[in-house]
């Protein structure tokens, strides 16, 4: 398991609410919680930047973190991430913030301490561009959307 440096920015984290942890040995994501001052209503179509009370420092340029939606919130309530995916670079050290978007038709109350997103560490490969006049041929070539078949 990889060590991840973390700073607790809200004293409720680790006392009233548990630190992010894996729910099962097979879990890929650590749940992030809404460390709001009070329960907050997210109106249909509204986005809100929600603090997690936590900052992390990955440090290893071969890793990054992604903030992803929780499937139940999206499927059952229409609550997804306003930026779809949050990318946390290895050298970022600020508070983790979650952009929540209510794409549903009814108001949704985000409770203080509610699990609103998940954090997943992913490997990163940095690349540089090698400018060429032509690419080696491939079977697909320049075929774009829908090129590989309809079903």
From Swiss-Prot:
InterPro entries listed in its UniProt record: dUTPase (IPR008181), dUTPase-like (IPR029054), dUTPase-like_sf (IPR036157), dUTPase_trimeric (IPR033704)
Protein's GO biological process: dUMP biosynthetic process; dUTP catabolic process
Catalysis: reaction(s): dUTP + H2O = dUMP + diphosphate + H(+)
Cofactors that this protein relies on: Mg(2+)
Enzyme Commission designation: 3.6.1.23
Annotated substrate binding sites: 70-72, 83, 87-89, 97
Gene3D superfamilies associated with the record: 2.70.40.10
Disulfide bonds: none
SUPFAM superfamilies: dUTPase-like
GO MF: dUTP diphosphatase activity; magnesium ion binding
Pathway assigned to this chain's UniProt record: Pyrimidine metabolism; dUMP biosynthesis; dUMP from dCTP (dUTP route): step 2/2
Superkingdom as given in the UniProt entry: Bacteria
Keywords annotated in UniProt: Hydrolase, Magnesium, Metal-binding, Nucleotide metabolism
Role according to the record: This enzyme is involved in nucleotide metabolism: it produces dUMP, the immediate precursor of thymidine nucleotides and it decreases the intracellular concentration of dUTP so that uracil cannot be incorporated into DNA.
HAMAP family recorded: dUTPase_bact
Family (UniProt): Belongs to the dUTPase family.
NCBIfam families from the UniProt entry: dut, PRK00601.1
Name of this chain's protein: Deoxyuridine 5'-triphosphate nucleotidohydrolase
Natural source organism: Pseudomonas putida (strain W619)
């Amino acid at each position: 398991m990889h060590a991840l440096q973390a700073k607790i920015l809200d004293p409720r984290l680790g006392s009233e609410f548990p630190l992010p942890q894996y729910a099962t040995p097979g879990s890929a994501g650590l749940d992030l919680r809404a460390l709001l001052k009070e329960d907050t209503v997210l109106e249909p179509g509204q986005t809100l930047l929600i603090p997690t009370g936590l900052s992390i420092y990955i440090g290893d340029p071969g890793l990054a973190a992604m903030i992803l939606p929780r499937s139940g919130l999206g499927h059952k309530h229409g609550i997804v991430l306003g930026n779809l995916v949050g990318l946390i670079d290895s050298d970022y050290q600020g508070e983790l913030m979650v952009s929540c978007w209510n794409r549903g038709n009814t108001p949704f109350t985000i409770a203080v301490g509610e699990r609103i997103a998940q954090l997943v560490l992913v490997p990163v490969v940095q690349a540089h561009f090698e400018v060429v006049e032509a690419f080696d041929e491939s079977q697909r070539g320049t075929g774009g959307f829908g090129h590989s078949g309809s079903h």
